[in-house]
Amino acid sequence: MSQRENVNPIREQNHRKNSRRYQKRAAARRRRNTIFIMEIVLLLILAVVLFFVSKLSKIEKTKLDMDKIEVNEDISQESRKIMKGYQTIAMFGLDNRSNGNLSQGRSDVIMLANINNDTKEVKLVSVYRDTYLDTGDGIFQKCNAAYAKGGPEQAISMLNVNLDLNITDYVTVDFNSIIECVDLLGGVDMEITDDEASLMTGYIRELNELTGNKAENLTQGGTYTLNGVQACAYARIRYGGGDDYRRTERQRTVLTAMVKKAQQSDLTTVNKLINEVCGDI
C-alpha cells in the first residue's frame, strides 16, 4: 500500500482546517501590524508638522498695507501663463547698523526666490543694489533706497513695477540674524582668496563692534569654515574683482551653503536654529 493510502482522511481534513485557520490569523496579525505601523508614521508626520507650526509663531510677522503695494497689471497673457505655478518671494537684507530693527534701513541685499510649486525647486536671483529703478512717484535712484523710504511695501512695489512681477510675500533679515544662523549651524565652508581675506578684515572689525563678537581675521586665502561674523563679512565685500556682480554671487553662495548645512543638521540643531533666529526674521 502506498504512503498516500496510509493517510487518515479525517486527520488530513482537520490539518487543512487548522492550516487555513492559522493562515487567516497570521494575515489578520499582519494587517493589524501594518495599520499600527501606518498609525505610528502618521503620528510622527503630524508631530513634525505641529513642531514646525509651533515655531512659526516666533517669526515677527508684519501685516503689509496691500493698498500701498503696486502690482504690474500690464503683464502679458504669455508672461502670466509662464508665471502660473510659481511663487516669488522678495528677500531683503538690511544695513541698519542696529539689531532687530527691520522696519527701516537700506536694503543692501535684494534677492528674489522663485519657487516651483510642483517640483519645489528654488532659484535665487539678485537685484544689484546700485541699479537705477523707479523707487516710487517716478523718482529714479539706486534701488536699495526704496526700503528706507517706504519700508517693505515700497520696496516690493519697486520690484513689481520695474520687473513685471506680482510679489506680495517677503522676508527681511539684518546682520545679526545671519550671524546667529551661521553660528548655530556650526559655520559654513568657503573657499577664500588672498584678496578676499584681506578685504574681510575691516568688515569683521565693524561686525565685532556691532555684535560684541570676537571673530578672528583671516591671514591668507584658503578653505575655511567661517563663523557667523566671518561669513557675513565675506558676503559684504564690495571691492575687488567683479564689483557688485561678485558681491551678489558671494551672498548667494553663503545663503546656499547655509541651506545645505541646515539640511544636514539634526533635529536638535534645527530646533535651536528656529528658536534663536525666527525672532530676527
Predicted regions and their residues:
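Flexible, solvent-exposed short loops/turns enriched in glycine
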Residues: 123-150, 204-205
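Flexible, polar/acidic helix-loop-strand segments at domain edges
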Residues: 183-270
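Extracytoplasmic
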Residues: 84-87, 104-110, 119-127, 138, ...
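Entry/capping segment at the start of metal-dependent catalytic domains
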Residues: 3-9, 21-120
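Second-shell loop/turn segments in exported
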Residues: 98-101, 141-149, 164-169, 237-246, ...
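Soluble non-cytosolic domains of exported or imported proteins
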Residues: 103-107, 137, 146-153, 172-176, ...
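Short, solvent-exposed loop/turn elements at domain surfaces
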Residues: 97-103, 121-124, 133-136, 244
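Solvent-exposed, polar/charged alpha-helical surfaces in well-ordered, non-transmembrane soluble domains
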Residues: 141, 145, 153, 157-161, ...
